[in-house]
């Protein structure tokens, strides 16, 4: 039987709770985080503010970036299947950036610059190849968040929990410092309700006008891709060597 002293148990509990507390700070959020697909990142590779172009990633995913002084950026590319017609999936690309706030209870609130958000909605079997491009502004509230070291993936993971407590898919640290566009209003207008074009309401543009595959017009950045903390191949070969050595010693004894 293994006995654990009260002091050791208290130390473990203190370590656990200190991790949770430390996770609720701007320092822990700092960087660019991306979903498991590792294909969607914030920054100029997703949205070109000069031409107001959303650039389609190779796979769906989500990405958030945070600075230590209260700015954020969001890039999402979601694809939904059509149960009635599998050949007619819908896709939505969304860009937002602005300021964030961490409340005393750990709640994370993202408040975008209203005039800068963009969204592209594509329903090829409905819109006949002409996607809808419009301004987008939506405040996001996360009940809480936590940052931890995911030993399986060898990366730091960001866990976000929506306002109702339901978890968002884990995001993994990809760049630090973050890969972001300038943290200012990129497309100022006279009023927040103005559209991306000169005409009233939102205008429909062809998909080819608005989405450019690949990473185009990528500006210079100081962001550095965050490598995995562990080399899977190295540890695999080390494990294999230990097993082999153990087998030899077993038969020699």
From Swiss-Prot:
Record's subcellular location: Endoplasmic reticulum membrane
Cellular component aspect of the GO annotation: endoplasmic reticulum membrane
Main location: endoplasmic reticulum
Superkingdom of source: Eukaryota
Residues making up the signal peptide according to the UniProt record: 1-23
Chain segments annotated as transmembrane: 233-253
Record's keyword terms, sorted: Endoplasmic reticulum, Glycoprotein, Membrane, Signal, Transmembrane, Transmembrane helix
Molecular function terms from GO: unfolded protein binding
Pfam family, any one: Rot1
Lumenal-side segments: 24-232
Function field: Required for normal levels of the cell wall 1,6-beta-glucan. Involved in a protein folding machinery chaperoning proteins acting in various physiological processes including cell wall synthesis and lysis of autophagic bodies.
Official protein name in the record: Protein ROT1
Organism the protein comes from: Eremothecium gossypii (strain ATCC 10895 / CBS 109.51 / FGSC 9923 / NRRL Y-1056)
């Amino acid at each position: 039987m293994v006995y654990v002293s009260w002091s050791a148990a208290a130390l473990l509990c203190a370590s656990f709770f200190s991790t949770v507390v430390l996770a609720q700070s701007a320092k822990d959020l700092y960087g660019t985080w991306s979903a498991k697909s590792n294909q969607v990142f914030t920054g100029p590779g997703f949205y070109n503010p000069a031409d107001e172009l959303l650039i389609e990633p190779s796979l769906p995913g989500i990405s958030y970036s945070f600075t230590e002084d209260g700015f954020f950026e969001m890039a999402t590319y979601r694809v939904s299947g059509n149960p009635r017609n599998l050949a007619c999936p819908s896709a939505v690309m969304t860009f937002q950036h602005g300021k964030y706030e961490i409340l005393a209870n750990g709640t994370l609130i993202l408040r975008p610059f209203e005039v800068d958000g963009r969204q592209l909605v594509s329903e090829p079997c409905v819109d006949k190849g002409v996607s809808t491009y419009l301004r987008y502004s939506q405040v996001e509230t996360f009940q809480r968040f936590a940052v931890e070291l995911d030993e399986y993936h060898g990366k730091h993971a960001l866990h976000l929990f929506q306002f109702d407590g339901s978890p968002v898919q884990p995001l993994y640290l990809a760049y630090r410092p973050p890969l972001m566009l300038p943290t200012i209003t990129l497309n100022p207008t006279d009023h927040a309700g103005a559209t991306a074009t000169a005409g009233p309401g939102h205008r429909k543009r062809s998909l080819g006008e608005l989405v450019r595959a690949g990473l185009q017009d990528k500006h210079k950045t100081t962001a550095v891709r965050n490598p995995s903390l562990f080399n899977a191949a190295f540890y695999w070969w080390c494990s294999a060597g230990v097993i082999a050595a153990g087998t030899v010693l077993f038969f020699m004894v």
